[in-house]
Amino acid sequence: MRVGTKSILFGVHNFVIHTAFIALAWRRLYGFPRDPRLWLAFLLHDAGYFGKRLMEGREGETHVELGARIMGRLFGAEWADFCRRHSRYYARSHGLRISRLCVADKLAFVLSPSWVYLPLARASGELWEYIDRSKDRQAGNEYFTAAEWSQVNSKDPREWLKGLQSFTYRWVLKNRFADEPDLRAHRGHAGFVDRRRYGPMRLLPKKQ
């Protein structure tokens, strides 16, 4: 069984667990996802990993296409585009703007505790690929802090995860208000989370 298939079935892109964390992230970012099409996008956006030999690189980046095709056939081109642009790397390489699904997807990673994320990544065999590629696969112009750089270079997967989650959290903070007016996304008060290790999360007001 290829690593992409394992990731969907019992790895970090597990249909049930990953979908739940994205829904939580979306709620923290934009309010409760009441539109059922959002839930289907949460479920299908990574379906293209099925059968992939690698999670990263050119092969892995095309994983956005299957979910986008399904969403497009069901709900039209706008929803296909919404799903397709959930990958930073795909969007950047095609000159596209990221969608809010991309931001929620990254916050879902940040919210995943190590006792959930690491066993899944080990079970599917994708952990070490992510560790090897994480230092040079981050999109945008941000850089690791000294503490993050030390952590992502650690041989301890727990330290690596802390460093990458910290870096990703800063990216989410910068991009959390990605606009999606064509999908009539939540336009009200969009607060954000005060990230704490495993405790309850407090919503902060949007800066005016």
For the regions a protein language model found, what residue spans apply to each?
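An active-site-proximal "capping" alpha-helix that borders the catalytic cofactor pocket
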Residues: 19-27, 61-74
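Alpha-helix N-cap and coil->helix boundary residues
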Residues: 33-39, 62, 78
